[in-house]
Amino acid sequence: MSDINATRLPLFFPPDFRPPCVGDADNFTLTRGENLC
């Protein structure tokens, strides 16, 4: 995993973690928290 992906995610979410409420799985790495429940 790139550190860039880790920095875009909240610190309490592991790089491999995908919130079940996020509808845009393709945009997961681009999620800034707006799509998180």
UniProtKB/Swiss-Prot annotation:
Keyword Transmembrane applies: no
Propeptide residue interval(s): 1-10, 21-37
Tissue/organ expression: Expressed in basidiocarps.
Post-translational modification: Processed by the macrocyclase-peptidase enzyme POPB to yield a toxic cyclic decapeptide. POPB first removes 10 residues from the N-terminus. Conformational trapping of the remaining peptide forces the enzyme to release this intermediate rather than proceed to macrocyclization. The enzyme rebinds the remaining peptide in a different conformation and catalyzes macrocyclization of the N-terminal 10 residues.
Alphabetized GO MF terms: toxin activity
Membership in a protein family: Belongs to the MSDIN fungal toxin family.
Protein name: MSDIN-like toxin proprotein 5
